[in-house]
Amino acid sequence: MLHTAFISNILANYLGAMSVILPNILTVTGDIKYIGAGLASVGILGTGVGQGLIGQGACLAIGRNPEMASKVTSTMIVSAGISESGAIYSLVIAILLIFVV
């Protein structure tokens, strides 16, 4: 008997607290999606660094061997496209978080 009253009291207090907390959590989730979109945009930093290193390597390679400029340039463009895909994925995720969720 004592345990039943104790547990029902705890359950009533828990539900009372949740009825106060849940509306606040639901209003905060609207703001959390912007934080998530910002964190998803962090992937763009790696893309910028990667493309910078690709450009640097291509310039150094063309400077050392100018005859291979066309091959180096085509390889650089393909590598930059592959590197850019990470930024595009980050952008898509950020847009989905802002407008869909």
From Swiss-Prot:
Please give the PROSITE patterns that the UniProt record associates with this protein: ATPASE_C
Per the record, its GO cellular-component terms are: plasma membrane; proton-transporting ATP synthase complex; proton-transporting two-sector ATPase complex, proton-transporting domain
Subcellular location(s) per record = Cell membrane
Say if the entry is tagged with keyword Cell membrane.
yes
Domain of life per record: Bacteria
Per the UniProt record, which residue ranges are transmembrane?
35-55, 81-101
Q: What is its main location?
A: membrane
Keywords, ordered alphabetically: ATP synthesis, Cell membrane, CF(0), Hydrogen ion transport, Ion transport, Lipid-binding, Membrane, Transmembrane, Transmembrane helix, Transport
**What does the record note on quaternary structure?**
F-type ATPases have 2 components, F(1) - the catalytic core - and F(0) - the membrane proton channel. F(1) has five subunits: alpha(3), beta(3), gamma(1), delta(1), epsilon(1). F(0) has three main subunits: a(1), b(2) and c(10-14). The alpha and beta chains form an alternating ring which encloses part of the gamma chain. F(1) is attached to F(0) by a central stalk formed by the gamma and epsilon chains, while a peripheral stalk is formed by the delta and b chains.
Job description of the protein: F(1)F(0) ATP synthase produces ATP from ADP in the presence of a proton or sodium gradient. F-type ATPases consist of two structural domains, F(1) containing the extramembraneous catalytic core and F(0) containing the membrane proton channel, linked together by a central stalk and a peripheral stalk. During catalysis, ATP synthesis in the catalytic domain of F(1) is coupled via a rotary mechanism of the central stalk subunits to proton translocation. Key component of the F(0) channel; it plays a direct role in translocation across the membrane. A homomeric c-ring of between 10-14 subunits forms the central stalk rotor element with the F(1) delta and epsilon subunits.
What name does the UniProt record give this protein? ATP synthase subunit c
Q: Which source organism does the UniProt entry give? A: Mycoplasma capricolum subsp. capricolum (strain California kid / ATCC 27343 / NCTC 10154)
